């Protein structure tokens, strides 16, 4: 009889949750297990979920300080817990998933689900172990700690201490790392480790709401000898804005749309530029690729930037002039700054975290 699948719960409110869920699911499959990834919010009320997802993106991109007020309010007051009743369809979908798949292990990458799980009948709750995968770094939102779990997985030791300060016993916290895509751990060629000389490869990942993004892209494209790739994501309007801003420089850059090949793409780069989202921050650390941060969403992303500070590689470059200057400084003296940057990232990198987490989940599932 095949063991039951590991049920992984995620939500589309930030790339970090989905990236962690996909990374763990792929690693479980590589280790011979099975996993089911589900988003009860999206599956139970897709239209309403898409509305709130778009509202979330609008707030973090255009009104980040308003988002921060909501984020902090949910940290200090039980607003989410007191409004769970409004999400009953998601709770019922979650219960249906558990009753259908009968998992022995549930791993969640979005904290609200642990509060739903606490509402399950005890005889159903006792049939599985709950593993909470914290996608925050350094500063941890209270929601990760305000409902029980059997284990908490965190990206690093400083985050473990922050979670412990919220009341979780240290023996229940495992700093395994952030479960990025297992392809980051493959022993394949890593062209981005080769010194760039004066001709670096630079990837700029544009946020749809980032003011000044196309202008930053034009600043990069104007640098002679640089191989520049501009990632515009799913929104074709972003690509059009970039092309208009580039004008005659358009032929000097590669435009990259939505892709699932980030491990191999990051492996080729000498520098990556983008906002301090949870997924991108962790992926650049895993790939040991120097990361220039254009934007830090207050509250939600401050911990990611704090993590880069902890490693000693934080660089805030909100415009083209700053980004070009930081890259040129790193390239000076035969790439001295770039080499130091890479060495610090290599010390912090845990590209196999998803595989070690998969092994833990499968051991609990046996």
Residue ranges and their predicted role:
Residues 190, 196-269:
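Donor-nucleotide binding loops and adjacent catalytic segments primarily
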Residues 23-100:
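Conserved N-terminal ligand/cofactor-binding loop architecture of enzyme catalytic domains
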Residues 123-183:
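Active-site-proximal region of nucleotide-activated glycan assembly enzymes
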Residues 179-194:
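Acidic anion/phosphate-binding donor-loop and adjacent secondary structure
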Residues 281, 285-326:
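Catalytic binding pocket for nucleotide-activated donors in carbohydrate/polymer assembly enzymes
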Residues 350-366:
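C-terminal alpha-helical cap of glycosyltransferases
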Residues 267-277:
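Acidic donor-binding loop of glycosyltransferase active sites
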Residues 315, 320-321, 327-346:
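Conserved donor-nucleotide binding/catalytic region of nucleotide-linked donor-dependent transferases
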């Amino acid at each position: 009889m095949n063991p039951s699948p590991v049920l992984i719960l995620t939500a589309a409110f930030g790339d970090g949750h989905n990236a962690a869920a996909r990374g763990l699911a792929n690693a479980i499959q590589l280790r011979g297990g099975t996993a089911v990834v589900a988003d009860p919010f999206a599956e139970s009320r897709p239209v309403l979920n898409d509305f709130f997802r778009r509202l979330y993106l609008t707030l973090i991109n255009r009104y980040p300080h308003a988002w921060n007020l909501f984020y902090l309010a949910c940290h200090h007051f039980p607003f989410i817990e007191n409004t769970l009743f409004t999400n009953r369809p998601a709770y019922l979908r979650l219960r249906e998933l558990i009753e259908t798949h009968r998992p022995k292990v549930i791993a969640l990458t979005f904290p609200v689900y642990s509060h739903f799980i606490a509402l399950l009948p005890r005889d159903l709750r006792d049939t599985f172990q709950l593993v909470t995968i914290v996608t925050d770094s350094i500063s941890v939102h209270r929601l990760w700690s305000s409902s029980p779990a059997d284990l908490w997985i965190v990206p690093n030791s400083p985050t473990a201490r922050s979670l412990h300060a919220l009341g979780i016993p240290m023996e229940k916290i495992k700093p395994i790392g952030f479960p990025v895509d297992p392809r980051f751990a493959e022993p394949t060629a890593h062209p981005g480790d080769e010194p760039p000389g004066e001709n670096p490869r630079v990837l700029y990942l544009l946020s749809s709401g980032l003011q000044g993004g196309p202008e930053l892209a034009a600043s990069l494209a104007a640098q002679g000898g640089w191989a520049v790739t501009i990632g515009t994501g799913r929104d074709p309007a972003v690509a059009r804005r970039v092309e208009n801003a580039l004008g005659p420089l358009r032929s000097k850059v590669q435009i990259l749309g939505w892709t699932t090949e980030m491990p191999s793409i990051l492996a080729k780069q000498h520098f990556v530029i983008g906002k301090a989202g949870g997924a991108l921050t962790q992926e650049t650390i895993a790939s040991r690729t120097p990361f220039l941060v254009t934007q830090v969403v207050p509250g939600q992303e401050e911990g990611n930037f704090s993590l880069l500070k902890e490693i000693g590689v934080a660089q805030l470059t909100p415009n083209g002039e700053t980004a070009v200057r930081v890259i040129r400084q790193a390239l000076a003296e035969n790439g001295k700054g770039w080499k130091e940057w890479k060495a610090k990232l290599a010390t912090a990198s845990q590209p196999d975290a998803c595989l070690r987490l998969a092994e833990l989940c499968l051991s609990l599932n046996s």
